């Protein structure tokens, strides 16, 4: 169920891929509806690292997402009868942004999505259309200001800067529990968010993670 954007011009349009309906609610409220669309990924995502194309193209989560992206797939097989062959001109978005919780489960879901994209539409990664939205790990509040730390090192620097002031520190909640204002500031507003552009070399790290995860099971 895509929550679309108002803008028709591809050069600014962004697709946020989020995990589940709970995240959909907060991201929907935080987005700029003019150019940001949101699609939730529901249920367990297929691990495309090992799955054959027959299984991949029977997975509704994957086929729905590919249809929303719009450019088809770079796979020559009779298994993808409902999806067109790849044509970059049909891509509907300037940025495809994966937005998951800042925890182990969120990292795993992100890895599964990246692996799926690299298996079916590697050109999108090679040409720089795929991004990850960083979510803060900590929210640090003093009497007059709120800070967001995206890792332990940033948390240490912020606490050092605060010095002897009283502060409250909270570890990040799931995206669905965050207020829309915080989501906009830290994850969606182009002026203040942090996006990581995915490079082809990053996929090797994703593959290593998935192999390790499968080994532990």
Q: What are the functions of these language-model segments?
A:
Residues 5-217:
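Conserved phosphate-chemistry cores used by DNA topoisomerases
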């Amino acid at each position: 169920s895509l929550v679309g954007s108002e803008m028709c011009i591809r050069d600014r349009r962004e697709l946020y891929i989020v995990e589940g309906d709970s995240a959909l609610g907060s991201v929907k409220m935080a987005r700029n509806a003019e150019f940001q669309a949101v699609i939730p990924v529901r249920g367990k995502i297929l691990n495309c690292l090992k799955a054959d194309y027959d299984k991949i193209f029977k997975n509704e989560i994957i086929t729905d997402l590919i249809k929303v992206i719009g450019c088809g797939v770079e796979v020559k097989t009779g298994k993808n009868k409902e999806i067109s062959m790849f044509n970059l001109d049909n891509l509907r978005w300037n940025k495809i942004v994966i937005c998951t919780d800042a925890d182990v489960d969120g990292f795993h879901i992100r890895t599964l999505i990246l692996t799926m994209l690299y298996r079916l539409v590697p050109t999108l990664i090679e040409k720089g259309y795929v991004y990850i939205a960083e979510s803060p790990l900590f929210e640090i509040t003093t009497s007059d200001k709120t800070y967001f730390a995206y890792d332990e090192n940033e948390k240490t620097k912020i606490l050092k800067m605060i010095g002897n002031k009283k502060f409250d520190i909270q570890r990040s909640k799931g995206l669905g529990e965050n207020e829309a204002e915080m989501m906009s500031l830290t994850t969606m507003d182009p002026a203040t968010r942090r996006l990581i552009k995915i490079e082809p070399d990053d996929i090797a790290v994703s593959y290593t993670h998935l192999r390790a995860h499968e080994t532990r099971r």
